[in-house]
Amino acid sequence: INFLVDFSLYDKNQNAVKEQYGGSDWNREAFSQQITHAKRQLELMAKPKIKVPRGHYTTYFGPAAVNEILGMMSWGAVSGSSWKKGESALGLLADGAKKLSPKFSLQENFELGLCPPFNERGEISKENLPIISRGNLENFLISSKTAQEYDLEDNGASQYEGLRSPSILPGNLKEEDILKSIGTGLYLSNLHYLNWSDQRGGRMTGMTRFACFWVENGELVAPIEDLRFDESLYKFFGENLIDLTQFTETFPETGSYQNKGIGGSKVPGMIVQDF
């Protein structure tokens, strides 16, 4: 990746819309469209917020929101050690007790060029390692330490066995069809405060953040009050996954705890029923 613009727009009431634009080839028109889109959302944020009653809704997650969910997979889901200890959020998938949608595929993809394909011990990883292919579990991330401990074959994973350069494959949902596909429901641009509420069961909790809206009859109506969700990945990546978007966004790692983070992800948006 050659550039990254990580920005937020605020109005006088401190309502905010957060966006990120990164890639290898700068496209002035695409960046301009993203700014225009963010400005329109900020205008909507000035409207009175709607309190959404507790329930289940058709929900669109923008790529940034999907990226937050994906980040949780590095905390006790894709780890080979967690699997062997019976703690993995994907354990039910590994055991055949739960299924994911054939529309969902996840890879550790160093071909993105977001970080080097070797870990802190200099061990080389495959350039593209399938984790989940069309809903089927293919690989856990297995470090050399875990491989030695459990007599497994390592695949160059880092010692903490988290995703470093993941990508979720896109689907068939066109950008212009997103609101129509929601009908009446939720449009969630960003999430935060995610955590496992039941790690072994694959349930996570979190809260909405920037630019989240109520949608009626295929139109953005107004922003929503912050809300908390608690849902199983076996539902939103499984039976309730309607589709993923045709477009994807790249999110370079921007963390700077102790040192500048490397890596990142490439993900689409997704639309889910009964969330």
Where are these regions (language model features)?
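Dual-mode signal for accessory low-complexity, basic/Gly-rich regions
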Residues: 93-275
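Amphipathic alpha-helical
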Residues: 79-99
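Generic, low-specificity signal for short hydrophobic/alpha-helical stretches with a mild N-terminal bias
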Residues: 20, 24, 41, 52, ...
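Internal alpha/beta scaffold segment
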Residues: 2-78, 244-251
